[in-house]
């Protein structure tokens, strides 16, 4: 009987189930969106029970539509929106509050207090991260401090914490496995990425009881099995877990030191594999764990851009400039340039390399002659500019000059954006045949654990390029284009509520 690997891709706006075969091909997939909750400005939450329901729904739909029997599944891999935090009652299995999403800024005040107390350097050294509302630790603290009775329950050992991967493994296994992997643990602000353990000093800083935390395991390992009534009577190995961006790095077969990928999803995330060495950043990047496999841990440098695909969604849904995201490419190509219009898409602050949660979005250079086409093109170009800042920081920290950049995510279908990205980076951009690299990465990790694939060399051979977009501009032209934009931004008169900071080649509007 033919066997498949089932990948569960739990994202920020939807859950998906993807079937992969031995050749690393996508056989079938199913998707279900779920509700976004915005209780207050800057807050973003999800109902963890609704997420679980969406996972069950897509599993059933995917297998049914593909006419694949549950017993044909060799293993399950899970990849997830990272940092999003869930706290639930160990006995009832019910969350005590909504999952606080990675985008949410509701713990910004907690972060400010921790910074004021001087914890920043200690956190950076142990976790490779910055004190920011982006990460899980302050979200857990917020729940314990703001949900009535939560702290007492936690201290009595009655509550469990997990990122979304942990929540799904716990549910699929019927509560038998409370685990996470190295990649997800490294995004919590509570995990020492050098000792590979939950860190007591970090937990004391956040006042989070250690008893709440999951066991941390490698990214490719059998963590448990599905219980009968959650998988049609079958006990299928749950065998691979990785945060979405690390899974994409694995799915892109970026196994060699210095290889990098950029994912254009809701946000934009560039990761470079730094091998078994954790490279400390001096340019605003994050040092994170890529994956743990075969007794070894691989590290990565990461640049996190909070707004990418969501900027295109905003043009569509908020500004009503087009009905389908694919139309943005058509509009952008109707004009030869932005005609001096520049967009800073800081809708939820700015991530790498600025890490400013207070900055807000802005546009500059608008005249009476500015058209919808100029505005759309400027928004698309802004995504490429942000990626350029990340790449410069990455090369400076690693000492490695990038030769090519592998790309994935929904926005890579936009040829205008990819060509412009290649020109601005002065690096060829490679788009794979299979764009579902996040789901594929989780499938590969699970498949390796159950012997479905032999090793990473076999996986490497399955990566095939769909299109290579080579830079058309000369390096001098690209640099001139960047500097011209920054000079124009500098010349704009900002309101009294903002200030601008120009540092070398970087401009940030605060």
From Swiss-Prot:
It catalyses: glycerol + ATP = sn-glycerol 3-phosphate + ADP + H(+). ADP binds at residues 12, 16, 266, 309, 410, 414. This is Glycerol kinase. The gene is glpK. Belongs to the FGGY kinase family. Glycerol binds at residues 82-83, 134, 244-245. Sn-glycerol 3-phosphate binds at residues 12, 82-83, 134, 244. The modification Phosphohistidine is found at residue 230. GO terms for biological process: glycerol catabolic process; glycerol metabolic process; glycerol-3-phosphate metabolic process. InterPro entries: ATPase_NBD, Carb_kinase_FGGY, Carb_kinase_FGGY_CS, FGGY_C, FGGY_N, Glycerol_kin. ATP binds at residues 12-14, 266, 309, 313, 410. The phosphoenolpyruvate-dependent sugar phosphotransferase system (PTS), including enzyme I, and histidine-containing protein (HPr) are required for the phosphorylation, which leads to the activation of the enzyme. Its EC number is 2.7.1.30. Key enzyme in the regulation of glycerol uptake and metabolism. Catalyzes the phosphorylation of glycerol to yield sn-glycerol 3-phosphate. It comes from Bacillus cereus (strain ATCC 10987 / NRS 248). NCBIfam families: glycerol_kin (TIGR01311), PRK00047.1 (NF000756). The keyword Signal does not apply. Pathway: Polyol metabolism; glycerol degradation via glycerol kinase pathway; sn-glycerol 3-phosphate from glycerol: step 1/1. GO terms for cellular component: cytosol. It is an enzyme of class 2 (transferase). Activated by phosphorylation and inhibited by fructose 1,6-bisphosphate (FBP). Keywords: ATP-binding, Glycerol metabolism, Kinase, Nucleotide-binding, Phosphoprotein, Transferase. Pfam families: FGGY_C, FGGY_N. Homotetramer and homodimer (in equilibrium). One of its GO terms (molecular function) is glycerol kinase activity. The keyword Thylakoid does not apply.
């Amino acid at each position: 009987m033919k066997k498949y690997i089932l990948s569960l891709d739990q994202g920020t706006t939807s859950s998906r189930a993807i079937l992969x075969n031995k050749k690393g091909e996508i056989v079938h997939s199913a998707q279900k969106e779920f509700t976004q909750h915005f209780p207050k400005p800057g807050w973003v939450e999800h109902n963890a029970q609704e997420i679980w329901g969406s996972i069950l729904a897509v599993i059933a739909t995917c297998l049914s539509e593909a006419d694949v029997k549950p017993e044909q599944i060799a293993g399950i891999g899970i990849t997830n929106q990272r940092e999003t935090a869930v706290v639930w009652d160990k006995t009832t299995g019910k969350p005590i509050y909504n999952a606080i999403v990675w985008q949410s800024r509701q713990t910004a005040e907690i972060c400010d207090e921790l910074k004021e107390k001087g914890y920043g350097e200690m956190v950076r050294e142990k976790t490779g991260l910055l004190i920011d509302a982006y990460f899980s630790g302050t979200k857990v603290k917020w729940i314990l401090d703001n949900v009535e009775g939560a702290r007492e329950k936690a201290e009595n050992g009655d509550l469990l914490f997990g990122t979304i991967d942990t929540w799904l493994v716990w549910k699929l296994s019927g509560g038998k496995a409370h685990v996470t992997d190295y990649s997800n643990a490294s995004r919590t602000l509570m995990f020492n990425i050098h000792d590979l353990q939950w860190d007591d000093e970090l937990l004391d800083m956040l006042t989070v009881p250690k008893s709440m935390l999951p066991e941390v395991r490698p990214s490719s390992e059998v963590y448990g099995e599905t219980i009968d009534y959650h998988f049609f009577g079958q006990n299928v190995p749950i065998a691979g877990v990785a945060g979405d961006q690390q899974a994409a790095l694995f799915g892109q077969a970026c196994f060699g030191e210095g290889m990098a990928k950029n994912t254009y999803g809701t946000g934009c995330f560039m990761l470079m594999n730094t091998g078994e060495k954790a490279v400390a950043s001096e340019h605003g990047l994050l040092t994170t764990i890529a994956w743990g496999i075969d007794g070894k841990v691989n590290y990565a440098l990461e640049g996190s851009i909070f707004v990418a695909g969501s900027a295109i969604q905003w043009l569509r849904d908020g500004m009503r400039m087009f009905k389908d995201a694919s139309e943005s490419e058509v509009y952008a190509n109707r004009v030869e340039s932005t005609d001096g219009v520049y967009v800073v898409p800081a809708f939820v602050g700015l991530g790498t390399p600025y890490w400013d949660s207070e900055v807000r979005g802005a546009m500059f250079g608008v005249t009476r002659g500015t058209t919808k086409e100029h505005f759309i093109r400027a928004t698309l170009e802004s995504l490429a500019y942000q990626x350029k800042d990340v790449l410069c920081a990455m090369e400076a920290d690693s000492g490695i000059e990038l030769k090519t950049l592998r790309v994935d995510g929904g926005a890579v279908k936009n040829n205008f954006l990819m060509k412009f990205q290649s020109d601005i980076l002065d690096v060829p951009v490679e788009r794979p045949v299979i764009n579902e690299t996040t789901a594929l990465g989780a499938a590969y990790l699970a498949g390796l654990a159950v012997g479905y694939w032999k090793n990473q060399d076999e996986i490497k051979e399955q990566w095939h390029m769909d299109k290579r977009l080579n830079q058309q501009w000369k390096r001098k032209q690209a640099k001139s284009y960047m500097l011209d934009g920054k000079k124009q931004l500098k010349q704009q008169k900002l309101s009294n509520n903002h200030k601008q900071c120009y540092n070398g080649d970087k401009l940030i509007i605060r």
